């Protein structure tokens, strides 16, 4: 998997939806602007900074086993973007917190497990708490199929390649003054 940060908010000039340069360990104009807003100490400025804060995303290659909404995706390797909750579920499988739990790499073609995404709305927000892993098993007994899946993976490096970041953009929101 790879991880990246982005910003997504509506400003006076329209929507700003871009990956954050902090992903590349570089200064990001929106993050710097948010810091300036926050440091004024004004609650109105802090509210603006909160609305513009960076968001964390993860991306992995996944084989779509079942997709009732879009059956044309079944059998294809897709890039799957997800948030902290699903990442924590993956991490808990790979690095269990308790001694009686066996570590498992869900991405392993022979000893991994399908991840069943179960989405529901809780208090107006999408919730993935009911998602779960199936019993670990080989993806297939057919080496040709395993090789085809392996060769169908997308480049994760491209997701966070420098050309995917618009470093020249600087968003400035009007700041309430004291």
Predicted ranges, named:
Residues 9-10, 133, 138, 170:
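Short linear sequence elements within intrinsically disordered, low-complexity coil regions
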Residues 1-105:
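OB-fold ssDNA-binding interfaces and closely related basic DNA-contact patches used
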Residues 150-170:
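Accessory, usually C-terminal, subdomains that scaffold auxiliary metal cofactors
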Residues 79-147:
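Extended serine/threonine-enriched, polar tracts that run as long, contiguous segments within proteins
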């Amino acid at each position: 998997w790879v991880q990246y940060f982005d910003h997504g908010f509506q400003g006076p000039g329209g929507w700003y939806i871009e990956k954050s340069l902090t992903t590349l360990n570089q200064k990001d104009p929106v993050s710097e602007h948010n810091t300036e807003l926050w440091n004024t100490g004004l609650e109105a400025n802090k509210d603006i900074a909160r609305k513009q804060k960076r968001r964390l995303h993860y991306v992995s290659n996944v084989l779509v086993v079942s997709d009732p909404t879009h059956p044309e995706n079944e059998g294809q390797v897709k890039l799957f973007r997800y948030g902290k909750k699903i990442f924590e579920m993956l991490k808990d499988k790979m690095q269990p917190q308790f001694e009686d739990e066996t570590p498992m790499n869900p991405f392993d073609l022979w000893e991994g497990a399908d991840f069943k995404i179960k989405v529901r709305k809780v208090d107006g927000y999408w919730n993935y708490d009911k998602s779960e892993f199936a019993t670990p098993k080989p993806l297939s007994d057919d080496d040709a199929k395993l090789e085809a899946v392996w060769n169908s993976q997308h480049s994760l490096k491209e997701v966070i390649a420098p050309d995917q970041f618009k470093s020249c953009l600087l968003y400035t929101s009007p700041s309430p003054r004291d």
